[in-house]
A protein has these predicted regions:
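Mobile late-domain/C-terminal helix-loop "cap" segments
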Residues: 251-277
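Charged, compositionally biased N-terminal leader segments and the immediate start
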Residues: 1-2, 12
Length: 277
């Protein structure tokens, strides 16, 4: 725990050192706000852990770790806009404090800041780290696109769902570990192994996150419960429910999924009850 705290403190210190232009404040204030919301800093911690696991000095991986954390928060900022989420980590989301256009543009700025930090990785690992980061970033966009497309489909399979969350969530945890391993001097085989471990960790994380969106405590979860239900997100629970429910339950679930107008709290309660059966 002492080592993790040292890593965490180092990450927070570097995040606090990010330099922003004085103007326009309307671009950079939302970035500072998003990063100030905190979080567990799981991805940068994994990067530093993986670096030291292969006998590297964790400080050599700090720039990459910070870049990954800024990038992760950029994805959350844009996700909140697309999902129309009002709360993130117990605080109003950027698009609620400002507006959607500001949130989109500030998110774009965060993506550029993230790449700037990734590109500061020291030789001889710069090229490999940048290439892996770009591959991961594009895969996350692919996963988000699948997620949006699945909202309009009723025939999403469990296999399609798993591939979607692999791209949307798991590849970033795998990438965080592999980037740290590369900087730490790991062999290609070892770096690939730790990447696969990170992917598995990411899949488990997303499955748990989907469950918490239905059954979690809002105070501990940090955002409103039921957002996935309101957006008809094809989570494992919804896919599984569609396979299990029959008769009137199946009709009720289909009615809620196709409803254009509804009371949000009523829909959340009704669909949750169907999940429980």
């Amino acid at each position: 725990m002492e080592k993790l705290q040292r890593y965490f403190d180092a990450i927070e210190a570097e995040l606090s050192k990010i330099e922003y232009a004085a103007e326009p404040d309307g671009l950079y204030a939302p970035v500072r706000y998003e990063l100030s919301l905190g979080g567990k800093r799981v991805r940068p911690l994994l990067t530093l852990l993986a670096c030291e696991m292969f006998a590297g000095d964790y400080r050599r991986a700090l720039n990459a770790a910070v870049g990954l954390e800024v990038f992760h928060n950029f994805t959350l900022l844009h996700d909140d806009v697309m999902d129309k989420a009002d709360v993130r980590r117990g605080k109003p989301t950027v698009h609620k404090v400002w507006d959607e256009n500001t949130a989109i543009l500030s998110g774009d700025a965060m993506e550029i800041i993230a790449f700037r930090y990734i590109a500061r990785t020291e030789a001889p690992h710069t090229g490999a780290v940048v290439e892996l980061f770009l591959k991961t970033a594009l895969e996350i966009c692919e996963g988000q696109q699948y997620d949006m497309e699945f909202e309009r489909r009723d025939d999403v399979t469990e296999a399609e769902y798993i591939e979607m969350i692999r791209l949307k969530t798991a590849v970033l945890l795998g990438g965080a570990l592999k980037i740290g391993a590369i900087i730490g001097g790991a062999s290609e085989t070892d770096a690939d192994c730790i990447y696969r471990f990170g992917e598995s960790l990411g899949l488990a994380f997303q499955l748990q996150d989907d469950w918490l969106d239905v059954y979690g405590d809002p105070a501990r979860f940090g955002k409103k419960i039921g957002g996935d239900i309101l957006n008809n997100k094809k989570t494992y629970m919804l896919i599984n429910a569609r396979q299990r429910v029959e008769g009137k339950d199946a009709e009720e679930l289909s009615r809620w999924l196709s409803a254009a107008e509804y009371d949000p709290s009523e829909k959340i309660a009704a669909v949750t009850a169907l999940y429980d059966r």
